[in-house]
Amino acid sequence: LHGFPELAWSWRKVMPALAAAGYHVIAPDQRGYGRTTGWSADYDGDLRPFRLLNAVRDAIGLVHALGYRQVAGVFGHDFGSPVAAWCALLRPDVFQSVALMSAPFGGPPALPFDTDRHKPKPATGPSIHAALAALPRPRKHYQWYYSTRPANEDMWHCPQGVHAFLRAYYHHKSADWAENRPYPLAG
């Protein structure tokens, strides 16, 4: 399951290796990506179809639509990681194993027992927005920014064109960008 801003096509170099190892591999476009349809693309549109459990249902439905009742595993990258994790957590009878990349999964949240007597504690710690704004070159948190109306407009109508926008986006995340400091993996 791909991440953001990606498509099933993102797995094109991984799929042959898995197939060569004997697996039947599929990589769908997740709901709202690629050529998927059935919801409003309007910024103010209903977001309920994009709830995490709907993405999990999509994965389970795809497995069943392809005629399987269980699969060897589900792989998730970036936004696909929590979807894959919840697939394996909620339906271990369907998804026999899980691999997660680029996004940690902390497990299910604790159940809110006794909330009538013990009110939830407010979040503590420094504000990420204040910390980023205080940098010598002020920045915005990308996930927060992507949820704003200006970001929506930027992505739908990039002045430089979609190709140049995505090329710059991926360059900014790459080891080729001078301000990015990747660290080699041990082993």
Predicted regions located by residue number:
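Conserved HGGG/HGGXW glycine-rich cap/lid loop of the alpha/beta-hydrolase fold
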Residues: 1-41, 77-82
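Flexible "cap/lid" subdomain of the alpha/beta-hydrolase fold that forms the substrate-access gate
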Residues: 33-75, 81-187
